[in-house]
Amino acid sequence: MVKRDFIRNIILALLAIVIFILLGIFVFSTFEIHKEAENAYLKNGDLVTIRRNIKPKYKDFVVYRVDDKDYVSRVIASAGQSATSMDDILYINNQVVDEPYIEKTKNDFLTTSPMGSLFTEDFNITTISKGNNKVIPSGKYLLLNDNRQNKNDSREFGLID
């Protein structure tokens, strides 16, 4: 009886380990926030859990890879949408978008910068896609950092898969 319980417990433990490993490979992963990716919500050194193989939504943070380096940015627009930033105002489908999540960083930047400085340089989907698109194509996303002075996002890399 004791031997059977011991074997059952070993099998259950091994099964739990295998399930945990499979979840880590296919469903969840962890990511450490680095200095360039920090913002009002994510700080340098924070360890976050990310879900794999899901379709991100507007305002979600996503981890993506470009040239074997990982980056964290926020989803601003997705397939079928147009996006323009002009004079520090973001427009999605020609509608002004409120971005309260960047206000503190933006205000800090503007109070320490020369008059007339822009927190977000002007762009649109045509400039980001090098003239190829006016709206975001299927399967692509416009990703921006909350700290818009850090241009390691769609403005540098183009639209992200």
Report the location of each language-model feature.
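Hydrophobic membrane-insertion alpha-helices, especially the h-region
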Residues: 9-26
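Soluble "head" domains of membrane/secretory-pathway proteins
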Residues: 2, 6-11, 40-161
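Aromatic-capped interface at the extracytoplasmic side
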Residues: 21-39
